[in-house]
Amino acid sequence: MLKKSQDRAPYAKLIEIQLKSGIIHNAMFDSDVEVLIAAGCSSDVVAHCKAVSNRALSIARGINVVVDHDLVRRGGLFHDIGRSKTHGIGHAVAGVAIGRNLGFPNELVNIIERHIGAGITAREAVRLGLPEKDYLPRTMEEKIVSYADNLVSGTREMQFYEALDRFKEILGPDHEGIELFIKQHHEIQGWIT
């Protein structure tokens, strides 16, 4: 297991080459966290991803519908793998490319792609400079990870109304993302036992 940042340096270069060539497979790693580290995610991003994964699992365990808990766990862990390349809105698109190169299943790649905010419409995607398509979470697992991500800032967990106020500060009170987040909250609250 890699512990020091200087110990990872040779591995990071090797992983970068293997990612570009498409020959890497995550079976070579002892854990999913090592995949994040090898992909180049900072310790802050890794800590955030762990927190989101834990929050998402907590949500999944508290609902009265059947979901794939392992997919939720891994989706929470890998949702921000694209932040190894960019911290901009394009990190989801970058994460999709990384996930595909790593051989992630489509269900996991979809979580990475659709986790931004409470989802992004095709119209908003174009405005943000993303490829024109909907980035709206569709499956329960996608919605749970997206929602959990919205409730975690760094590693600090927030309640819905605190997160909503934060969204309003960042996006403005009339942004379509606010309505999507409120709708997402009500949908997930409806699943809770």
Model-derived features with residue positions:
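Acidic/His-rich, divalent-metal-binding segments that scaffold phosphate/diphosphate chemistry
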Residues: 2-90, 98, 123-125
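Short alpha-helical interface patches
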Residues: 12, 33, 148, 158-170, ...
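Alpha-helix boundary/capping residues
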Residues: 39-40, 115, 171, 185
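Intrinsic structural disorder/low-complexity segments
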Residues: 51, 82, 118, 187-188, ...
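Alpha-helical scaffold segments in carbohydrate-active enzymes
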Residues: 55-58, 150, 187
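Divalent metal-dependent catalytic cores for phosphoryl transfer on phosphate-bearing substrates
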Residues: 62-167
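Charged phosphate-binding loop/patch that engages nucleotide di/tri-phosphates or the phosphate backbone
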Residues: 172-193
